[in-house]
């Protein structure tokens, strides 16, 4: 597979962040967002093309997993936590 450009990596990062924000559960949503940020930050200085391709493929697989889990989360929604509830004024 050809090496990915910076624009492709940024696009993948944005897709992961956008999809992670769709989790109906606060806990899953914050975990996914934190995990995406930390994963990309951890691998910021990877220069090896093979390693970069491997990481990009893993990120694409993770995007597919997140999309599936978001769909499942919407099908089987649970009661909202205190953090998610609207304040009563």
Curated annotation (Swiss-Prot):
It is found in: Mitochondrion; Nucleus. One of its GO terms (cellular component) is mitochondrion. It comes from the Eukaryota. Its main location: mitochondrion. One of its GO terms (biological process) is iron-sulfur cluster assembly. Pathway: Cofactor biosynthesis; iron-sulfur cluster biosynthesis. InterPro entries: Complex1_LYR_dom, Complex1_LYR_LYRM4, ISC_assembly_LYR. Keywords: Mitochondrion, Nucleus. Pfam families: Complex1_LYR. The keyword Disulfide bond does not apply. Required for nuclear and mitochondrial iron-sulfur protein biosynthesis. Belongs to the complex I LYR family. This is LYR motif-containing protein 4. It comes from Danio rerio.
